[in-house]
Every structure is written in C-alpha cells, then in structure tokens.
Amino acid sequence: MLKKSFLAVLILFVFTLAACGNKEEKISDDDREKVIEDGTVGFEMMGGNVEKAENVPEADEKAILASFDEYIAALNAEEIDRYMKTISKNPKGFKYDEEKTYATEVFDQFDIKRDVENVTIAKYAPEEAQVFANMKMHSLQLETNVEHESAGRQVTVFVKEDDAWKVTSVFYIGDDSQSSTGN
C-alpha cells in the first residue's frame, strides 16, 4: 500500500508539472545558452509577493488571463482535446505529442482538481507572458482511492501563437508544509 501511495504522489507531482517536459530530452547548445542568458522564469518564485507586470496592454491582459483560466478549466474538466487547445504546437518545455499521451493517461488514472489564487501576470512581452499563481491540488487515484492534497506556486509561460496565447512551459514549486496523502 505504501508503494502505491508513493507512486500516486510521484505521478501527481509529475503531472503538476504537466507541461514541463521530458528531462531526458537533449537541448541544443544555442537553446541551453538562451535559457541561461534569459533565465528560467523572469522573476523570483520564492518569497512573499509577486508584482504585477506594469507594461501589459489591457487587451493582452484580458486575453492572457482568459487563456490561463481556460487552461486550468480544461485540466479540471479532464477534457483532453480542450486541454490540448491551450497548449502551444511548438512548446519550449515539452513535446506536444508526448504531452497529449501523458495527459490522457493521467486523466484516466486520476481525478485532479486545481484551485488557483493570486493569479498575476508577472512578466510580459508582446510575444510571451509569465503568469504566476498559488495553486492547491486535490487528487484521487482512481484505482486505489488514495487522496492527495498539495499546494505550491506555479508559473505558466504563454506564447502568442496564431493570435492566441498558448502554454509553452510550466514551472512549479511545491510547498510540502501544505501537502498530505491519505485514504
């Protein structure tokens, strides 16, 4: 039973990163240099407050926040086609086809609901935006009925693609003090 509980927690953690990608994937030297040069996310995820980016045009702010809301709603509804419509076709943090396969498997094995608070556009450029949110996740592994609660901070990176904002990568830091597993 402990092994199944551990597996449930491990799978949940991996899915929390949903679009973070395959760590075995090799990136080119140019891409690696760009990541180092640009930084992984454009602000500090640790600490108290995340400041709202001041340079966001009103129309883009509405569109970005609507895209984030749809991304979370699609995950919570566990609707794979709807979820994949929120994902970039050319993501930086994962492979599109692998994400679809993986998300389908997770949707089949878990009932996961995400509650988000303090949603803030923390960094903005005309073609990329970083959305910060505090997140609480409630999951149930369907086969074992093992429940898990977790909380953390997530940055969802969006890119402008075909005049819409799509998820290109996700960064998550869990808060172990707010996590629990039980039946």
List each model region and its residues.
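Sec-dependent N-terminal signal peptides
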Residues: 6-12
